[in-house]
């Protein structure tokens, strides 16, 4: 969200709620407030309505306002959302919720009960203290119910309001979010919180779509290599790729590679990141040799060869990305790059120290795909 759009939206909301009977009980909440405290423009706007049945009443109130549209409520979770027209055909989607507590008995992110509560209890059910901040829409006062959120923003520390073991059990995706925050926002995960990030049983129940979204955010950060290393170190990479999790230290035993397979894969990822690579290139860089640990041949001298690893890696990459529910267009582009990465490599003549167009003759029709990616 652009800074100007955010400011327009907040000012318009202030005007709209002037005749709302619980206007003093409306707060900006979560990542929105965290970003403001950090001096950054929020990416989205979330509201907390600290009033009985606040979500439903607020949505009903907004239905009388021409600037608001697209109303949706989720009664079970006591949440809702709407679109705010800030002018010049610009609309911003805003989510709203009441303070709530949840109980989990049937697995992560499937609360058995959701009950309205007060802001303090709401704050302690959230993922991290830095996200448990509330800014009064009208007065601008910032509430820090955990007593740690403002300090954690200042010191860029990530810790959970409750015992991290319970916080991660309630929603194990928070473990991936912690690693993502460390990569994208340069937060340091507190020692206690970090020690509880692990391959807990609840992690197996997470949907692949949710894992994909966090994995993508990690991969698209400038510190993606660090993020992948953390995922492997905490035994969380297996939901993405078991081969990667189990074989990160695989020795290639080949005169062309002085790095382990894992070191090489991460080095290639780091290289394309420096060039500002998009998602497809980053995925291809990470998985271009993914099948090497399971398709090598032992030569007479004891060294390894990897004939056909490009084709096998392409097959495995398709399985990985399909399992993660990536769009077909993304999968096809990544698989093409992985399958042909040895051919692309041959465009460079190492003996003469220059690029040659000869291999392009074999891939003329596909070359535009490489350039588009």
Predicted regions and their residues:
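Catalytic cores of the polymerase beta-like nucleotidyltransferase superfamily
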Residues: 1-365, 372-373
